[in-house]
Amino acid sequence: MSDINLDWVDRRQLQRLEEMLIVVDENDKVIGADTKRNCHLNENIEKGLLHRAFSVVLFNTKNRILIQQRSDTKVTFPGYFTDSCSSHPLYNPAELEEKDAIGVRRAAQRRLQAELGIPGEQISPEDIVFMTIYHHKAKSDRIWGEHEICYLLLVRKNVTLNPDPSETKSILYLSQEELWELLEREARGEVKVTPWLRTIAERFLYRWWPHLDDVTPFVELHKIHRV
């Protein structure tokens, strides 16, 4: 690992590589902890290292989804368009708590504030709906990748945004049709989109979007989608 060149990575991103993430098995049972760096190295992923994560899809009251473009100084998938916020609960008592996925929802509140500058009082853990879980794996490049048991969370609220440039290059709100257009542009090689945004859009959002007033029928708390 010592010979990996990270000169291009933002200093704050380097510091976050030492955060302790929650290591799980394929059924989301906690089996330990490891650094963010180790969890995202392909050499460890190929040996089966798997960690807990989350993806947030945030809609405003006009039913437009917040899409962010990842900073060019992110370690994985730099410059890619992605979901509203994706990150990890940390290996600490508050974010390990599993009842009603409260630990993950606390982590999501923390990262929505850190990445997008959304004040904590604007989105509480109670505003964050735990929808389902998916298990995914993706390579960013020959060194770095993702292998996650990912909690899919939904928020529908108007918020104030002040993105951290070390995390987020740009933000935009898209209608359902505009999101499909973005995915079509990615298929033509015109833009870069994270694999998990495509997964979320194609596997889940097409069903949820017409029913944002009440997504309760689509909640799947005990299912892990293998994608």
UniProtKB/Swiss-Prot annotation:
Keywords: Cholesterol biosynthesis, Cholesterol metabolism, Isomerase, Isoprene biosynthesis, Lipid biosynthesis, Lipid metabolism, Magnesium, Metal-binding, Peroxisome, Steroid biosynthesis, Steroid metabolism, Sterol biosynthesis, Sterol metabolism
A single cellular component GO annotation: cytosol
Pathway named in the protein's UniProt entry: Isoprenoid biosynthesis; dimethylallyl diphosphate biosynthesis; dimethylallyl diphosphate from isopentenyl diphosphate: step 1/1
Chief location bin: other
Cofactor annotation: Mg(2+)
Binding site for substrate: K36, R70, K74, S87
Annotated positions binding Mg(2+): H40, H51, E146, E148
GO MF entries: isopentenyl-diphosphate delta-isomerase activity; metal ion binding
GO BP term, example: isopentenyl diphosphate metabolic process
Co-factor remark: Binds 1 Mg(2+) ion per subunit.
Residues in coiled coil: none
Recorded superkingdom: Eukaryota
Tissues in which the protein is found: Muscle-specific expression.
Boundaries of every Nudix hydrolase domain copy: 49-199
Record's keyword annotation contains Magnesium: yes
Active site location: S86, E148
Subcellular location: Peroxisome
pH dependence: Optimum pH is 8.0.
Motif (Microbody targeting signal): 225-227
Pfam families assigned to the protein according to its UniProt record, in alphabetical order: NUDIX
Biological function: Catalyzes the 1,3-allylic rearrangement of the homoallylic substrate isopentenyl (IPP) to its highly electrophilic allylic isomer, dimethylallyl diphosphate (DMAPP).
Protein name (database record): Isopentenyl-diphosphate delta-isomerase 2
Organism of provenance: Homo sapiens (Human)
Native organism taxonomy: Eukaryota, Metazoa, Chordata, Craniata, Vertebrata
